[in-house]
Amino acid sequence: MVPEYSRFYNILGYNFKDYTLLIRALTHRSKTKKNYERLEFLGDSVLSFVIAEVLYKQFTDLAEGKLSQLRSKLVKGTTLAQLASSLKMDEYIILGASEQGGHKREKILEDVFEAVIGAIYLDSDFATVKKVILKWYQPIISSINLDTIKVKDSKSKLQEILLQNALSLPEYSIETIDGKDHEQQFTVVAVSKDLNLRVKAQGTSRKKAEQKTAEKMIEMLSQQGLHEKK
């Protein structure tokens, strides 16, 4: 065990046989060409399968569409960033000079989380990495309440509200992109011609900005008495 990583191994609940895999998983592309991107690709697939399997077995009455939405919520975005932070991954991320301070950025935390999973898989086997993933996710999965959880993303929910009321779908477009490459802010506009509505919101990616725009439009529709029909 490499001394400086012994604490991290304890937090992860896994001891690397080849610690260079862990180093690669923690290294951002701003530092070197030997970075975490390939491991991130692998870890993304491993994580998606493990979570899909546990959801399939645990929620036997849930339809395919709902399972997909729930899996998406668990393997993307804020969930991964929060898990990465809880496992102290942000304290070990290796960044180049151009990315200093980026160890708290959500996108980097998401990527590193997936890369570490890819590294554990290569360092061991599928059964081992599955066990580690389920340990990390256990508090989240055990607390899932299908009666209250929002498994539908905002764009999907908005689409259903509009279709249920025989209204055309909104058109999304990027208004502006501000900031440096690693700190971009996207401003997205959504237009509903049938309702004569124009809404805009910002996010650190186009996808996030579109979701926030959809959330705003849902709120406006709610004020007009338009809700999703159960």
UniProtKB/Swiss-Prot annotation:
Catalytic site: D44, E114
Provide a Gene Ontology MF annotation, just one: ribonuclease III activity
Cofactor dependence is on: Mg(2+)
Q: Where would I find the RNase III domain in this sequence?
A: 5-125
- Name this polypeptide is given: Ribonuclease 3
Organism for this UniProt entry = Francisella tularensis subsp. holarctica (strain LVS)
How the protein assembles, per its UniProt entry?
Homodimer.
Q: SUPFAM superfamilies, per this entry?
A: dsRNA-binding domain-like (SSF54768), RNase III domain-like (SSF69065)
Root EC class: hydrolase
